[in-house]
Design a protein with these regions (language model features):
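Cysteine-based protein phosphatase catalytic domain of the PTP/DSP
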Residues: 2-93, 97, 112-144, 149-151
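Short, solvent-exposed helix-helix connector turns and helix-capping sites enriched
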Residues: 25, 107, 186-187
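Short functional micro-motifs and their immediate structural scaffolds
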Residues: 100
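Short, small-residue alpha-helix embedded
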Residues: 103-112
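Generic structural signal for hydrophobic residues
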Residues: 105-106, 121, 161, 165
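Short, amphipathic alpha-helical interaction segments embedded in low-complexity terminal/linker regions
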Residues: 126, 143-197
C-alpha cells in the first residue's frame, strides 16, 4: 500500500517533507514543532501562494516539475535547511504532492550535508514515503552530484528507470522489464546521453 500521508519525518525534530496540505495547516505545523518552511511550488499567479504568518521562517523556490529541469536550485534549499537546523528551527519542505520536487531537495540535503550517496538517500526516502517519484531530470542532476561527491554513481539513471518500471509493472519479470526499457529508451530519456553511466 502506498504511503499517502501528508508528510513524513526524515530527521526527528529537524527535517520533514510532504505535500501542500500540511503546509496550509499552521496549527499542525506548530504541533510538530516546525519553525521553517520551504515551498517549491511554481504558482501560476501570486493569489495561489500559500501564505504563512511571520513566526515561520520561509523560503519560496518556484520550481517547475518537468522532466527537462535539473536540480541546480537544490543547493539554495539545502543551505536554508542547514542554517535553520543549526538554529534549532525544524524545517518542513513541500511541493504540491510531496512526490518529486520536495524529495529531490531532501535527497540533495542528505547527500551534501549528511554524506549519504544517492542510492542510500533515495531508498531512505522511499521507505519513509513510498510515493516519491523525482523526475528524470532531477535524478540525472543528483546522479551527477553523486559522482562528484563520492567518486562514482551509486544509482544510475538506467537503474532508476528500471526500478520505476518494475514498480509500475510488478507482475512482469525482470528480463521483460529490461526489454520494455530498451524498446522505449527514447521515450523515457531526456536526450541520448542521459543513459550514460
Amino acid at each position: 500500500m502506498k504511503n499517502k500521508e501528508d508528510y513524513c519525518c526524515v530527521i526527528p525534530n529537524k527535517l520533514y517533507f510532504g505535500n501542500k496540505i500540511l503546509a496550509k495547516d499552521e496549527t499542525r505545523l506548530r504541533k510538530l514543532g516546525i519553525k521553517s518552511i520551504i515551498d517549491l511550488i511554481n504558482y501560476e499567479n501570486s493569489s495561489q501562494e500559500i501564505k504563512h504568518s511571520k513566526d515561520f521562517n520561509f523560503l519560496h523556490l518556484s520550481i517547475e516539475d518537468v522532466p527537462t529541469n535539473n536540480a541546480d536550485w537544490a543547493e539554495e534549499g539545502s543551505n536554508f535547511i542547514e542554517e535553520q537546523i543549526k538554529n534549532n528551527n525544524p524545517v518542513y519542505v513541500h511541493c504540491s504532492q510531496g512526490i518529486s520536487r520536495s524529495s529531490t531537495l531532501i535527497m540533495h540535503y542528505l547527500m551534501t550535508r549528511e554524506k549519504q550517496n544517492l542510492k542510500t538517500a533515495f531508498f531512505k526516502l522511499k521507505d519513509l514515503r513510498n510515493i516519491i517519484d523525482p523526475t528524470t531530470g532531477f535524478m540525472k542532476s543528483l546522479s551527477n552530484l553523486d559522482e562528484k561527491l563520492f567518486g562514482k554513481k551509486s544509482f544510475t539513471i538506467e537503474e532508476y528507470s528500471l526500478f520505476c518500471l518494475k514498480e509500475s509493472f510488478p507482475d512482469i519479470d525482470e528480463s521483460e522489464i529490461k526489454d520494455i526499457y530498451e524498446q522505449n529508451k527514447k521515450f523515457y530519456s531526456l536526450n541520448n546521453d542521459i543513459y550514460l553511466k
